[in-house]
């Protein structure tokens, strides 16, 4: 690529709308790295001969980060949506053999090509909203071959699309039918066979567990964390979504990158997260879709200074959401977060939730030039508009990878 100066833009380099530069420029070298940024009037003379790209006054933010998704799976769960509308709870559906296990059946039956095509269709709306990094979990295979298949598809998405994909092994997502009544034996399989094999194959960037009364116990969760730690893999946790099971405190003991959901999180768990540097990942799409009523403890998270990230939690059962911008709106309207909080929640804090704050979530000299240009009058509009296409252009590694067609 040619060294390029992107100019005539309004710059929000760290995802905070109070830290901006009007009439700014970003100089990107031939490697796709940011060589300089600041006010256009201060552009050093050494960049005068570089190619120019005029963004016509657009707002520019770091590329967005969707730090919690289940993007690869087979089938849908539209039938369960109808059940919930009729009053059947998420937990009851799971106990009846639906929920995660129904998606497991569909995912096991699908081949890699089918899973790739379906996941690619889910990914593309996110890319058109400025997402340049995404986490994708396994967890709908629940056996070695199927978990491998999911993680391979996730890796392929990162190779075939202009997005950085981080994979999370979520083998301890639910108990597969063949292990009914034998949860400890299944955890043996996860820890002794599945995790080591998939890690050795280079398919795992982090490890997650669903710690809940309809998921896995604290003791079982700790076994998975121990297995991950032995292999040098960071951990994450689905925690405190349906009850206060104490998973967050356990996650903090293992210095988890993040604890996610957190509707029933208590102050002791928050204090543990703060001490461990664990990010709180809130998932308003799931809260909305299954009509939860217990709000995450936003005020306590603020009080203790725990960084808050937001994510789509895209999945077929509780958050079939393909819009990170709608997630921003939900963070404000449902969780009563501020615009600066939600914007940082999908940039710097989302990057921290992946352990990649040094690579994503900010625009700084020496970093890869991943950014999005927005046709808005103010950054608050990113959380304000519902359903309007706002992203004009996405640049990854200094190369334009998306431009909105007008007219």
Swiss-Prot record:
Keywords: Cytoplasm, Histidine metabolism, Hydrolase, Iron, Metal-binding, Zinc
Reaction catalysis annotation: 4-imidazolone-5-propanoate + H2O = N-formimidoyl-L-glutamate
Enzyme Commission number: 3.5.2.7
Pfam families xref list: Amidohydro_1 (PF01979)
Cofactor: how bound: Binds 1 zinc or iron ion per subunit.
Pathway assigned to this chain's UniProt record: Amino-acid degradation; L-histidine degradation into L-glutamate; N-formimidoyl-L-glutamate from L-histidine: step 3/3
Purpose of the protein: Catalyzes the hydrolytic cleavage of the carbon-nitrogen bond in imidazolone-5-propanoate to yield N-formimidoyl-L-glutamate. It is the third step in the universal histidine degradation pathway.
Entry protein name: Imidazolonepropionase
């Amino acid at each position: 690529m040619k060294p390029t100066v992107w100019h005539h833009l309004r710059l929000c380099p760290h995802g905070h709308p109070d830290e901006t530069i009007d009439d700014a420029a970003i100089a990107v070298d031939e490697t796709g790295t940011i060589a300089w940024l600041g006010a256009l009037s201060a552009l050093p003379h050494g960049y005068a001969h570089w190619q120019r790209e005029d963004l016509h006054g657009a707002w520019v933010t770091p590329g967005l980060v969707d730090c919690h998704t289940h993007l690869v799976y087979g089938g849908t769960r539209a039938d369960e949506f109808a059940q919930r509308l009729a009053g059947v709870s998420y937990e009851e559906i799971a106990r009846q053999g639906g929920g995660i296990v129904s998606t497991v059946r569909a995912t096991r039956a699908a081949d890699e090509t089918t899973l790739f095509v379906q996941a690619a269709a889910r990914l593309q709306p996110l890319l058109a909203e400025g997402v340049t990094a995404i986490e994708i979990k396994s967890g709908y295979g629940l056996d070695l071959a199927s978990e491998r298949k999911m993680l391979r598809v996730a890796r392929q998405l990162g190779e075939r699309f202009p997005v950085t994909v981080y994979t999370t092994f979520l083998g301890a997502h639910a108990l597969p039918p063949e292990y009914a009544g034998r949860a400890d034996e299944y955890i043996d399989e996860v820890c002794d066979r599945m995790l080591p094999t998939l890690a050795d194959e280079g398919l795992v960037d982090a490890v997650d567990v669903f710690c809940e009364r309809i998921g896995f116990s604290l003791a079982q969760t700790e076994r998975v964390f121990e297995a991950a730690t032995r292999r040098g893999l960071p951990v994450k946790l689905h925690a405190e979504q349906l009850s206060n099971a104490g998973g967050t405190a356990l996650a903090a003991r293992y210095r988890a990158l993040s604890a996610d959901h957190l509707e029933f999180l208590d102050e002791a768990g928050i204090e543990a997260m703060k001490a461990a540097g664990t990010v709180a990942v809130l998932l308003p799409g799931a809260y909305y879709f299954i009509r939860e009523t217990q709000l995450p403890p936003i005020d306590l998270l603020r009080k203790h200074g725990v960084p808050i990230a937001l994510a789509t939690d895209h999945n077929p059962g509780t958050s079939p959401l393909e819009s990170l911008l709608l997630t921003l709106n939900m963070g404000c309207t449902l969780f009563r977060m501020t615009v600066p909080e939600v914007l940082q929640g999908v940039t710097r804090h989302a990057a921290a939730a992946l352990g990649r704050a040094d690579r994503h979530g900010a625009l700084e000299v020496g970093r890869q030039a991943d950014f999005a240009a927005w046709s808005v009058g103010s950054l608050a509009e990113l959380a304000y508009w519902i359903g309007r296409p706002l992203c004009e252009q996405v640049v990854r590694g200094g190369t334009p990878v998306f431009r909105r067609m007008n007219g």
